[in-house]
Amino acid sequence: MRIAVDVMGGDFAPQEIIRGAEAAVREWGFEVILVGNEEAIAKYADSRLCLPVVRAPQVVQMDESPVVAVKRKPDSSVVKAVELVKDGRADAAVSAGHTGATFAASLFRLGRIRGVERPALASVIPNEQGQTVLLDIGANVDCKPGHLLKFGIMGSLYARQVLGVPNPRVGLLSIGEEASKGNEQTLTVFPLFERAPFDFVGNVEGGDLFSGRVDVVVCDGFVGNIALKTGEGVVRTLEKAVKQEVATNWISKVCALPTVYTLRNIRKRFDYTEYGGAPLLGVNGVVVVSHGRSNAKAVKNAIRVAGEAVRTNLVGTIAGGIGDVRENGAETADG
C-alpha cells in the first residue's frame, strides 16, 4: 500500500513529518512516498530506508488563498501528493499543511464522487464507550440541508466500514434534543434525516459528542470546527490544572502518585495525535488531512488512517451508498 506524504506541510515540517512517515514504515510496513523539497528530505530522512522521493519545489503557505495557491503552484508538495493518487502511483495522500489547499487540490485533481456536492472532513473523537465520528469539521462553513444529508450518509458509512460499527447511530448537532429546537438549517434537515438510509436517533447536544450516545454527529463545518477545537482546548486546560494542583506542595505530589497511571491513560484517550488525521470524505480518492501541529506520532497515525481507508475500500463504499440514495430519489432539490 503506497501512501504519498506531503513533507513540507505543517508547523513542524519537514523533520517531524519525515520522522512520522518513517515510523509508519517501520511499524506497519507501508510504502511511503516523500513529496517535497529534495534537499530538506535528504537532510532529515533515514537513508537506510531508501524511501522514494517525488520532487516538489513549491510550498503553499498558510496565509495564501487555497484556490489561488493550488492554481499558481502546481509543483507544490500538497498538489504533487494528491496528483500521485490521481495517477495511480499512490493509494492515498496525507498532508498536515494548509487544509484549504489540500481540499482544493483534492477537488481539482481527484474530483468528487458522483452525487456528492460537498466533500466533508470527518474527525474521530473519543467518547465514554469508544469513538465518535464528527463531520464536517471545517471544509464547509456554510451548508445546505442536502449537504448535511450526504454528510450523514458518508459519516455512517465511515463508522461502519472503517471503525467497524455494525449499525452506526447518527445524531444531528443542535441546541436541544427536541425536533422543534434548532435554527432554520437543523429544522429543515431533521425530516430529511428521518427518511435517510441510516439510524437517525434525533438531535444531540454538545455534551453528546463525548457521551457515546451516538456514533456519528453531523453539523456544518463552522460549528464542527469550533466544537472540535473547544474540546481540544478543554483537555489542555484540564491537564494544566492537574499539573498545577499537583505541584503546589509535596503532599499533593505524594497523593497524586497512585493516579498518575490513570491520568496518563486518560490523556492518551484524548490526545489528538493518537487519532492522526481527518479523511476528506466525498472526493474520488483517499486524502487525509492531519493537524497543523502534527508531530511525528500524529503523522504516523494519519498514515494509518489513510491505510485503513484504502484497505476497507472506503471510496467505493461511499460511492455505492450515495448511488443508492440517488436511485431511490432521496436527494433534495437544494443540493
Swiss-Prot record:
Molecular-function annotations in GO: phosphate:acyl-[acyl carrier protein] acyltransferase activity
Keyword Transferase on entry: yes
Protein EC: 2.3.1.274
GO biological process: one example: fatty acid biosynthetic process
Alphabetic keyword roster: Cytoplasm, Lipid biosynthesis, Lipid metabolism, Phospholipid biosynthesis, Phospholipid metabolism, Transferase
Catalytic activity of the protein: a fatty acyl-[ACP] + phosphate = an acyl phosphate + holo-[ACP]
One annotated Gene Ontology cellular component of this protein: cytoplasm
Pathway membership: Lipid metabolism; phospholipid metabolism
SUPFAM superfamilies, sorted: Isocitrate/Isopropylmalate dehydrogenase-like
Keyword Acetylation applies: no
Compartments reported by the entry: Cytoplasm
Functional description taken from the UniProt entry: Catalyzes the reversible formation of acyl-phosphate (acyl-PO(4)) from acyl-[acyl-carrier-protein] (acyl-ACP). This enzyme utilizes acyl-ACP as fatty acyl donor, but not acyl-CoA.
Subunit and partners: Homodimer. Probably interacts with PlsY.
Family named by the database record: Belongs to the PlsX family.
NCBIfam families: plsX
Protein name: Phosphate acyltransferase
Naturally occurring in which organism (per UniProt): Desulforudis audaxviator (strain MP104C)
Gene from which the chain derives: plsX
